[in-house]
Every structure is written in structure tokens, then in C-alpha cells.
């Protein structure tokens, strides 16, 4: 049995959860999320103490694997609609900067042209000091994917550390080639 999966998921007071088979709908102050969980698990809502219990339907390996996954997905949905998620990125390098125009993030990262990224539904971009980009939303998976796309515009290089990196990310630095003496 999954050690993560056997813990019940607490539901805050402002959040409502509805089940339709394996489809879980979570509604909270920040918005609404819906997700269909994989086969092999069953979900039940305990109304008396506001918890959600995820349990495997059989003892097969696939069912046990999906048990912890499903519990974590539901917990992330509840956390997202109550508090939201955000991921910060730093732009390092001379002349590299970012700005927001409407729902579009415009990044000047050393190319001959600025790179534009349109924010998908449920994601917002915020720029501080032209070098710090904050990607925020209620869906943890979508926030992480969009932050990864922003980082992929110009990943940090190991010699000078220039590029776009996650806040707090440590870049493994390499020594440059030593010249002939």
C-alpha cells in the first residue's frame, strides 16, 4: 500500500469537492479544476470531518502505483483552488529582459528578435525589475509546464551562467579552456 496514498486529504472550509465516478471537481475561492483520475483507484468524500480518501480497487501492481499518484493529484487540486501556485524565474545576462504586454510575455534573451509567449487559459505572467518572471495559476502541472517553456527560451549556460533559470536553481559551472602558455 502506498504510504502517501493512505493519508486522507483534508478539505478546507471554502472548498467544495464533487465526484462523478473517477472525475473529481474541486471548486474554491481561486477557481475551479476538474480531473479524471486513472483506473484502479476509488475516491470517496467523508462529509463529517471534511476529508477525501483515495483507495486502490485491487492489490495489483498498477492499482497500487496509481494510488499515491491519485491522492497527490487531488491534494494538488485542493491546494491550487485555495492558495494557487507560482514559479519564479530569473533572467541573467547583459541586455536580457522581459516584459508583459496584455497576456503575452515578451523576452529579449540575446536573439536577433524578441521571443513572445502567449499565456494559456488559467496562467498569468508577472515581471518584476525586468529580470524576474513569475508564472502563476491554480493548476500545478500547467504552471510547471509554462515555467519550463519560459526557461527553454534560453537555458542557462555553464560557463558564465547567462540565461533563464528558476529562482534558487544552482547552475553547475565549468572552467573555460586554459590557453597555451
UniProtKB/Swiss-Prot annotation:
One example GO MF annotation: rRNA binding
A Gene Ontology cellular-component term: cytosolic large ribosomal subunit
Domain of life assignment: Bacteria
GO terms of biological process kind: cytoplasmic translation
Pfam families linked to this entry: Ribosomal_L6
Keywords for this protein: Ribonucleoprotein, Ribosomal protein, RNA-binding, rRNA-binding
InterPro entries per UniProt: Ribosomal_uL6-like, Ribosomal_uL6-like_a/b-dom_sf, Ribosomal_uL6_a/b-dom, Ribosomal_uL6_bac-type, Ribosomal_uL6_CS
PROSITE patterns recorded: RIBOSOMAL_L6_1 (PS00525)
SUPFAM superfamilies: Ribosomal protein L6
Subunit structure: Part of the 50S ribosomal subunit.
Family named by the database record: Belongs to the universal ribosomal protein uL6 family.
Protein's job: This protein binds to the 23S rRNA, and is important in its secondary structure. It is located near the subunit interface in the base of the L7/L12 stalk, and near the tRNA binding site of the peptidyltransferase center.
Name of the protein in its database record: Large ribosomal subunit protein uL6
The organism of origin for this protein: Synechococcus sp. (strain CC9605)
